[in-house]
Amino acid sequence: MAKVISRPYNPKSSGLQSHMGVCRHKRNKVGIGLLLQLKRRSIMKKIDIYEELKSNDYPGRGIVIGKSADGKSAVKAYFIMGRSVNSRNRVFIEDGDGIRTQAFDPSKLEDPHLIIYAPVRVLGDKTIVTNGDQTDTIYEHMENGQTFEQSLRTREFEDDDPNFTPRISGIIEPNKGGFDYSMSILKSADGNPQSCQRYTFSYNNPLDGEGHFIHTYMGDGSPLPSFEGEPKKVAIPNDINEFTDVLWNSLNADNKVSLFVRFIDI
């Protein structure tokens, strides 16, 4: 099942182009913390992703991965936002089993190296999703026997001084009768490009109706403040249309550009 919603590009406006793609895809056949002498289970509260997005005018690019509430689907979502005409002049198009970005109006394309890439690629029964061309890095390294984490050791944050935008990535990998997923962020050391901080978060056998959300920025600003902490726990519903529509409607109307959602039968 696929659905695309587009808003016509208006050259007299700020250049906002919105596009939303949705498809259903069949796969090819807590921490425990110590506090003094007391052991306590660290419980991350589940946030309302819709309220989270509504309260943040500019989360940048974001990835959601999890399991549908009925336990039948692995779910992933990816969105992009933009403030400049160049960043807003993009749509998602299908590319094999994945997607790639493309300039809506090629005549307005300025610097493609950070905005034109494949956010989603499928390698066998694994699905990769990222906010940049590290999708290809992960694909190529894993094709040659390396792991998700090993492949990302060859990359770092983006070179968009002074923001040094984090590279965020995720992967869904099947296991016996289910799946695992991982998320990664590569970021500067509080805005200092002399150090790259690499974090990987792995989730084995996710629970029904639960997922995690990671994005590039804490909000708007100059420079843009990088995401902090670990991916946020969120609820994942059963209905792809409901999930897509509410995500899209929760993103800031002036800054949202494109959204892609996929439910994978498990």
Where in this protein do the model-derived segments appear?
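Short, Lys/Arg-enriched N-terminal segments with co-localized hydrophobic residues
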Residues: 25-43
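Serine residues within intrinsically disordered or low-complexity segments
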Residues: 6, 13-14, 18, 42
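Conserved short alpha-helical segments that host acidic/polar catalytic motifs at enzyme active sites
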Residues: 38-266
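Intrinsic-disorder-associated, low-complexity terminal segments enriched in Asp/Asn/His/Tyr and depleted
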Residues: 9-10, 19, 25-28
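Residue-identity detector for glycine
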Residues: 15, 21, 31-33
